[in-house]
């Protein structure tokens, strides 16, 4: 008994943009469904019930056939995989090669096979893939960005907007959702889209998703590990910076400061206590915040330095030697 969840309503929009499989026995929100490719069955791992059978494999044919027949026919039984993000699921026919006029027919057929909307979506998805590859982002982030852009396109919110800007903003949100946060400056540097344009498109997307997505507040810990890695700082400095930034946020010392500036200031403070010192300029180049911003945040941390550095830390004895700014 295979069933799909109903289309999103104002009550369940927050869960997903697409239909999900549902086990009528377990009746849990996210059932653990596995697929038996040999038998074509969908099985609930929780209760063992077969929730679907005779499932058609929608992936591309993976076997390679030798073209030994004189007819020259292609024995592959399917084309590309179905793309659920396209309005017609990318199902279409193609003109085979053969006569001298087939090239013209193929171009005309490809132009008419997809509607204008789907052609625009395909172009956007291709750009998302290119940017994601350039940023070394995992497939999960790319898939999430595709979903976000498709949702915006359905809402007609992409009309009159910069496609590159909307794509970059979708990647920014997708990174946050997948706990791989990137700054606007990082996205701008890697996508060649102006920072202001990304910020503007992000605000538009955030307003559109206000009733659908819960964008969690960025924490300083989201950036500490990556910044320290780029600065080639040892693990003890990274852990110390994470502790300082968390304590500063919990104590309300840096109220009103952005998590990125707090992270940068925390890394600067702990690095000054260690043999692996880094300048404010070096940290500014990596974090994307100005040296002035780092200094202002550092002043707040410096005022409470004895409380931020634990007494059992190997760096505690060096607190008195911290620079004042």
Swiss-Prot record:
Its main location: nucleus. PROSITE patterns: TFIIB, ZF_TFIIB. Keywords: Metal-binding, Nucleus, Repeat, Transcription, Transcription regulation, Zinc, Zinc-finger. GO terms for cellular component: nucleus; protein-DNA complex; transcription preinitiation complex. The keyword Transcription applies. Sequence repeats lie at residues 131-207, 227-303. A zinc finger (TFIIB-type) spans 19-52. Disulfide bonds: none annotated. InterPro entries: Cyclin-like_dom, Cyclin-like_sf, TFIIB, TFIIB_CS, TFIIB_cyclin, Znf_TFIIB. GO terms for biological process: DNA-templated transcription initiation; RNA polymerase II core complex assembly; RNA polymerase II preinitiation complex assembly; transcription by RNA polymerase II; transcription initiation at RNA polymerase II promoter; transcriptional start site selection at RNA polymerase II promoter. It comes from the Eukaryota. It is found in: Nucleus. Gene3D superfamilies: 1.10.472.170, Cyclin-like (1.10.472.10). GO terms for molecular function: RNA polymerase II complex binding; RNA polymerase II complex recruiting activity; RNA polymerase II core promoter sequence-specific DNA binding; RNA polymerase II general transcription initiation factor activity; TBP-class protein binding; zinc ion binding. Pfam families: TFIIB, Zn_Ribbon_TF. Zn(2+) binds at residues 23, 26, 44, 47. General transcription factor that plays a role in transcription initiation by RNA polymerase II (Pol II). Involved in the pre-initiation complex (PIC) formation and Pol II recruitment at promoter DNA. Belongs to the TFIIB family. This is Transcription initiation factor IIB. It comes from Dictyostelium discoideum (Social amoeba). The gene is gtf2b.
């Amino acid at each position: 008994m295979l069933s799909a969840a109903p289309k999103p309503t104002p009550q369940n929009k927050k869960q997903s943009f697409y239909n999900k499989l549902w086990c009528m026995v377990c009746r849990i929100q996210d059932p653990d469904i596995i697929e038996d490719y040999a038998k074509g069955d969908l099985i609930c791992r929780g209760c063992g019930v077969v929730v679907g059978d005779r499932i058609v494999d929608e992936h591309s044919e993976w076997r390679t056939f030798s073209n030994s027949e004189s007819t020259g026919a292609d024995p592959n039984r399917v084309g590309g995989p179905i793309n659920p993000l396209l309005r017609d699921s990318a199902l279409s026919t193609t003109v085979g090669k053969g006569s001298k006029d087939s090239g013209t027919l193929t171009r005309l057929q490809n132009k008419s096979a997809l509607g204008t909307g789907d052609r625009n979506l395909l172009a956007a998805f291709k750009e998302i893939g290119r940017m994601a590859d350039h940023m070394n982002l995992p497939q999960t982030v790319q898939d999430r960005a595709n979903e976000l852009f498709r949702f915006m396109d359905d809402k007609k919110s992409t009309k009159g907007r910069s496609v590159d800007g909307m794509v970059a903003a979708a990647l920014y949100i997708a990174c946050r959702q997948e706990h791989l946060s990137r700054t606007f400056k990082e996205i701008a540097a890697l996508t060649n889209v102006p920072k202001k344009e990304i910020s503007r498109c992000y605000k538009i997307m955030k307003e559109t998703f206000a009733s659908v997505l819960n964008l969690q507040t960025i924490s300083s810990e989201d950036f500490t590990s990556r910044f320290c890695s780029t600065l080639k700082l040892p693990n003890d400095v990274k852990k110390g910076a994470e502790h300082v930034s968390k304590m500063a946020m919990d104590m309300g010392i840096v109220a009103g400061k952005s998590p990125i500036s707090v992270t940068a200031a925390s890394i600067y403070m702990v690095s000054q206590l260690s043999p692996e010192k880094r300048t404010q300029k070096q940290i500014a180049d990596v974090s994307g915040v100005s040296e002035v911003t780092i200094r202002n945040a550092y002043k707040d941390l410096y005022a409470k330095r004895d409380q931020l550095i634990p007494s059992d830390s190997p760096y505690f004895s060096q607190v008195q030697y911290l620079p004042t700014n």
